[in-house]
Amino acid sequence: MTSRLPFLVNRPLLARLDREWQVLNHRPAVLRRARGWGLGVPFVSLDEVVAAAGYRSGTPAGSGTPAGPAGATEQPAAAANEVLRRLLLAARTDDVAGRVVLQRLLPGVIARARRWGVHRVGGSSDAFDELLSATWMVIREFPVERRSHCFAAALLR
């Protein structure tokens, strides 16, 4: 008889990421810094930047994915892609821009960790840790110049 591996992601790490996001989200110094990235969209919180980069709220309650920004409106795909492109350019040298991109990608990273985790000895917790680390490196080094569309999908490959 075979046992099914745990189907959970690293909850403590997700909780730390969530606490970090809550601290950064409305901090005036962080928002001033973000306005220097030339995103071309107005915002009063980093949640609004994530929404402008194409994040779509509406994930099922209790799914373990971050809640969508309150009151944020969905951007057309081309506009969202351009915001994400500019964030990726800023993320090469700015950790906060990289953190915004990571927040945009977290639901996809969590979903992939859950899928991969059932096949791993360490479960989805280990898969999430590894994917998060790899995602950060990809965000910081993504070759924006070689791609013109679908940045979020390319980042999650």
Please annotate each region the language model reported.
Residues 104, 126-134, 149-157:
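Structural recognition of an alpha-helix C-terminal capping motif at a helix-to-coil junction
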